[in-house]
């Protein structure tokens, strides 16, 4: 059981979740795009949210700036979060268009706001769970897409909510976070997504 729960730490790693969100979006809205557009956007997301952050991690570790694999120390989170924020900004500014892919545009804008908020909290001496931030933002994005396209993803949403609990349990089991840090990470992930609903989702309902 412990191995099963701990697996969710890796399945829903913060670097992987934006790729899951992109895949989910194009599974729902693929008929509105050409295949080459889907491949191009997915490739850009994969490079900027997984490959480059992993490369930076190994660079910082080789330079002695990072010691642990899971960034338990608050100071170790500063550079990765700042770098990830820049990559998200590049992705938003050059890969998406608010007129062409508004749903993904606002999802990643929400992720950027959450990442900057997590960085601000670290600078203020507080730590939030990046895992909970990622999975909660994805869950809210799924709810938004369900409402926007009038498609009932009740089972998927229920599964994601259950996964939120399993991710939280895995982080507690690993003694990586306190309950307060998990709750803070969840709020940091949820609030920007809900706030941006007022821009792209609610006007269309």
Predicted features and spans:
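Short, Lys/Arg-rich, polar N-terminal cytosolic tail immediately upstream
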Residues: 1-6
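Short, hydrophobic transmembrane alpha-helix segments
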Residues: 27-40
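Membrane-water interface of transmembrane alpha-helices
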Residues: 51-64
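Juxtamembrane helix-capping/reentrant segments at transmembrane boundaries
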Residues: 68-84
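C-terminal halves and exits of single transmembrane alpha-helices
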Residues: 81-100, 122-124
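Membrane-embedded catalytic cores of phosphoryl/pyrophosphoryl-handling enzymes
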Residues: 105, 109-205
